Amino acid sequence: MNILLDTNILVFISRSKNFNSLVNFINPENSLIYISIVTQGEIQSLAVRKKWNEKRIELIENFIERIGIIDVNQRLIRAYSDIDSYSQRENPSFETYPFSTPRNMGKNDLWIASVAAMMGLELVTTDNDFDHLNDVFFDIRKIQPVDFLPFF
């Protein structure tokens, strides 16, 4: 299955001292890798706000040039609507929900989740924010932050 990287994964990639090994760890099956246009915006904003050095910026920009970037389109907007209404327990396509209270997601996370759903991609993340969507809209592969330590 092809994969979609959450923004937090790109942050770990940008910090890596062993880039190729880390990418192999994240993508052991050598699947196609994608990010959302939102992730690209988030990572560029982080680089500016956190004053990343040129080497770190160049590393992540070179990586982004080698992967697919999914832009906003009408299908993505529909997926966003489905996921947001599901997360708020207000999606008419569902009679029951496996969670008792609404799951408030950040808007950028909603866009990222929508890309995974629309494209049928496995989302690779360190966050718990997507857990309620797992096996409903897409699959999630969660990596614990401690698992990145050997690559720094």
At which residue positions do the language-model features occur?
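Short active-site oxyanion
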Residues: 1, 30-33, 66-68, 117-122
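Helix-adjacent hinge/juxtasegments
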Residues: 60, 64-72
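A generic structural signal for short hydrophobic patches within well-formed alpha-helices
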Residues: 10, 19, 40-43, 77, ...
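Active-site neighborhoods of divalent-metal-dependent phosphate/nucleic-acid chemistry enzymes
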Residues: 69-122
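Acidic, PIN/NYN-like endoribonuclease modules and their adjacent C-terminal/linker elements
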Residues: 113-152
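Generic structural signal for small/hydrophobic residues in well-ordered secondary structure
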Residues: 6-7, 43, 80, 116
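Short, well-structured N-terminal submotif of metal-dependent ribonuclease cores
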Residues: 1-36, 45-62, 152
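General small-molecule cofactor/ligand-binding pocket signal
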Residues: 34, 70, 141-143
